Amino acid sequence: MTFWRMQLHPSDSTRAVAHTTRSLGLGYVGLDFADPLGDLTDVKQQDIDQSQRDYWDFAHCMDVGDIILVVAHHYPCALARVTGPYNYIRAPEVELGVWFRHFRKIEVLGYYADIVTHPAKWEKTTMTDTISILRDPDGVSHQLISKWLAKLGE
């Protein structure tokens, strides 16, 4: 099981929480590109802009059972478990309520504000990229996920 950190909003950060909660409520996490690329299973990692190469990992490295710390405005928002494979649609459908073309089905394990109810006590998890694999078990986000899973009895 791999731990991930992810933001769920397009470039419009003024609606980050709205996009995040809507995506989670629908049971999906996803991402997209400013310069559209197609299905990531058909794309070589080196063909993706350097600033977005981590997106390739979403299709090729993320597995069912992996855990995602969803972040909004540099604070933990939710913890989710990946329950489905990588999917791609050519164009997002507004009726579906998602803005992204690259997505995975998830199960929300919990919301951070339900565990730490006083915002002044929230742990800041500065995040400037859209998605990243958490490789350092001593890192703040990795430790937060481990503690959260322990509270959930997982």
Question: What name fits each language-model region?
Answer:
Residues 57-70:
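Short coil-to-beta transition motif at edge beta-strands of beta-rich domains
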Residues 9-11, 71-75:
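Short, flexible beta-strand-to-coil junctions
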Residues 1, 60-63, 97-98:
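Short, surface-exposed loop and linker segments with low hydrophobicity and enrichment for Pro/Ser/Thr
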Residues 1-59, 149-154:
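Compositionally biased, charged N-terminal/linker segments
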Residues 3, 67, 103:
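Beta-strand-rich binding-surface signature
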Residues 64, 73, 77-78:
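C-terminal accessory regions
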Residues 75, 81-139:
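Aromatic- and Lys/Arg-enriched surface recognition patch
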Residues 137-153:
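Low-complexity intrinsically disordered segments
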